[in-house]
Amino acid sequence: MSHPPTILRKTHPLLSLGNSMLVDLPSPANISAWWNFGSLLSLCLILQIITGLILAMHYTANTELAFSSVMHICRDVNNGWLMRNLHANGASMFFICIYAHIGRGIYYGSYLYKETWNVGVILFALTAATAFVGYVLPWGQMSFWGATVITNLISAVPYVGDDIVMWLWGGFSVSNATLTRFFTFHFILPFILAAMTMIHIMFLHQTGSSNPLGINSNLDKIQFHPYFSFKDIFGFVILLGVLFMISLLPPNALCEPDNFIYANPLSTPPHIKPEWYFLFAYAILRSIPNKLGGVMALAAAIMILLVIPFTHTSKQRGIQFRPLAQVTFWILIADLALLTWLGGEPAEHPFILMTQIASTVYFMIFILIFPILGRLENKLILLSKNTGKFNWNLTY
């Protein structure tokens, strides 16, 4: 009696891990393009690590040479200009995908997979830290003053704040030691991100993906390859196309003009601001006139994502069938867009007042409005069931 042939990808100790994650993974049959952003983030991370390693071969972490070494990469290194443009604009694409991924998680209730969601929020915080220390490396005006302003905020932490700032700076101000430290952090953090991504995927595969209907999909699953692998590749093509188009046509469109000026500690830029993808958090920071309060608000702007699973009161998983919550969700998106714009404006009237209102709305939506709407919609559904007009199935 002949035995069926053994399939190496299913029996090999290492290949079987990849097989269970990328080939034979049971996936809900109805997941849409909004579920592509996880794989797009993996692509962005791989691209950033590759281009970053190439740039690190030519970069010099020294205050006297850092700015010149970046110019040397762009002018003298073969395709160095392309690597630098891909790395700089790749960060923007990275954060676009992150925000879309988080938005999808909020819209479709993916945060109810608490372990996966919490690891994802930690990944977001680590990515933000990586991007911040990377922004300092070219040693332009905005690099220097951004590092000075943001790191100085840590001094607001009671008792230990000043000591932490001194350790970060390696002295009494942002200096050569600071640049060396930041280059070290920027080099090692992406590899920590890659390890955390594996943990994120492991937790996800314990529960399986959610789906656009928000119901249990165990009865209708298909294998990941070839159905969703080709769908992901289509997303890769679009992302790479947009990234190369930006990097080749307007490569500096998303960069800060002041950062093309060599860092000068004696000349403060008229308006210090971070990259565009941090402007919403920077606006929330500036909305509080107190230093410690601003730091707490900045941390809360990201850490509030950890609270969402515990303030979920609706009997439905997502908001795709909840009109009131949908309106609130899109108000949140508009509010974030407004905060992003306000973060790039000077800290003066009327922008300060607008920022304070927008920041209050941001926190109110997560802490108060979403939970209240969840309970209200539960009551409306119960009322409609009692009147016999609709037959609702609320299990997920």
UniProtKB/Swiss-Prot annotation:
GO molecular function, one term: metal ion binding
Other observations noted: Heme 1 (or BL or b562) is low-potential and absorbs at about 562 nm, and heme 2 (or BH or b566) is high-potential and absorbs at about 566 nm.
UniProt membrane topology term: Multi-pass membrane protein
Cofactor note (record): Binds 2 heme b groups non-covalently.
Name under which the protein is recorded: Cytochrome b
Pfam family, one: Cytochrome_B
Native source species: Lampetra fluviatilis (European river lamprey)
Family (UniProt): Belongs to the cytochrome b family.
One GO process term, biological-process aspect: mitochondrial electron transport, ubiquinol to cytochrome c
